[in-house]
Amino acid sequence: MLSFWDVAIDFSPEERECLEPDQWDLYRDVMLENYSHLDFLGLALSKPFLVTFLEQRQGPWDVKRQAAAAVHPGKTVNKCKDFSKAFFCKSLLTQHQRIRTGEKAFKCEECGKAFNNRSNLSEHKRIHTGEKPYKCEECGKAFRIRSKLSTHQRVHTGEKPYKCEECGKAFNSHSNLSEHKRIHTGEKPYKCEECGKAFSTRSTYYRHQKNHTGKKPYKCEECAKEFSYPSLLKVHQRIHSAEKSYKCEECGKPFYCPLLLKKHQIIHSAEKPYKCAECGKAFHYPSLLKRHQRIHAGKKPCKCKDCDRAFYSSAFLKRHQRIHSEENSYKCGECGKRFCSFPHLQYHQRFHSGEKPYKCEQCGKTFSTLSYLPWHKLRHSGEKSYKCEKCGKMFYSTLDLKKHQKIHEYKCGECHYGFPNYAALTAHQRVHTGEKPHVCEQCGKDFSRIDSLNQHQLVHTGEKPYKCEKCGKCFYRSSSLKRHQGIHS
């Protein structure tokens, strides 16, 4: 026969101790409802003592204490000597005291890590066993810890109960809110002992530490590139498979992972909360503001050891350094030019092949990269909705406007000519100073730009990498090939 305890919610003493007042209200309502159903069916032979307490409708914490007393009759309250907190279970008092003293009596036999209670040790052991007992019914994703599943389920419901008082942004977990708050406070509690660099989140700190160890155990079978994390390898492998599953609804641009899509979508929103105090320019991300501020300070802290070239950020330096490394760079088989990433090499190779796989259905114009196509399509609408606040000039897209705005930002003090980036401005300023730092080892001729030197060196090698498909004539420069192709058209 069905009894009350067959349908009751059976909490362990530890679980009961952790319930909040509103959770106890829910617990009480469900327990009483279950009992009323049994009573209606004539299956409740006698009223359990716990139900009697719950029917008194006392405050949830009174119910909690009395319910615990009902389940464990005759047990006295166990009180912490140093603090006023009391526990019905002695095991909970012991666990509480270990937290205060820092004692960690439960040790993992696999790796030696110690914990102050058995449940934390059990959760930790699942790292070694790979066990993930808590599964999401919505998407099938599994978790080691029940609380992680609860946080994950908010992704499906859209619930974000934790709100930042500073900017109003909401989060699905308290830990994410705590990490976000550090943007406002500037707090960086995780410091690298190796180089002294500090981080606001534990995950970025751990990721950084792998730079010092140099360990990259996850290798791409396609191009032999190595990664510190399996997730990074997985994202990278989509480059080879051309799989871009995550598409922006605003402009149609596809991405390899949801994180990149989310980051991209901020561009479409008008919100730019991070403003430069020096010039008033606003940014979507704090990292972009920090990098921009180095322009005003004239700082380029990240210097290349191989060629003395300096950069505003370590990301730009790392990308540049691949050019010097034969192992990590991507070499063009046609002209020998090296690139820091595989997509850059692919894009470059289309100059040799003349391939333009992305076609506009409206006018038939073709493009070598997919990113140009959505912006081109805006020109057919005839609308120029984006206005430059500096000069009033109108543009079809935010991309065109941003490209134009850089001309106002990077201006030559000598002739007031504008440039799209700092590197182009620096190269131009050498026209006024007469500086030519790039010298040809073959003939001693010097150049103001590195790309001019690279093109000049083809004269010595006799190499003409740019070939006309119509007549077979070869050229040193892509610009010369384009000019020549006008003869055939």
Swiss-Prot record:
Main localization, broad class? nucleus
Q: Offer one Pfam family short name for this entry.
A: zf-C2H2
Q: Which keywords annotate this record?
A: DNA-binding, Metal-binding, Nucleus, Repeat, Transcription, Transcription regulation, Zinc, Zinc-finger
> What does the record say about tissue specificity?
Expressed in liver, testis and, at considerably lower levels, in brain, spleen and heart.
Q: Got a GO cellular component term for this one?
A: nucleus
Question: What subcellular locations does the record give?
Answer: Nucleus
Keyword NADP assigned to the entry: answer is no
The name on file for this protein is Zinc finger protein 58
- Family per similarity comment: Belongs to the krueppel C2H2-type zinc-finger protein family.
Q: Write down the InterPro entries for this protein, in alphabetical order.
A: KRAB, KRAB_dom_sf, Znf_C2H2_sf, Znf_C2H2_type
Q: What does this protein do?
A: May have a role during differentiation processes.
Q: Give, as residue ranges, the zinc fingers classified C2H2-type.
A: 78-100, 106-128, 134-156, 162-184, 190-212, 218-240, 246-268, 274-296, 302-324, 330-352, 358-380, 386-408, 410-432, 438-460, 466-488
- Taxonomy-wise, where does this protein's organism fall, top ranks first? Eukaryota, Metazoa, Chordata, Craniata, Vertebrata
Species of the source: Mus musculus
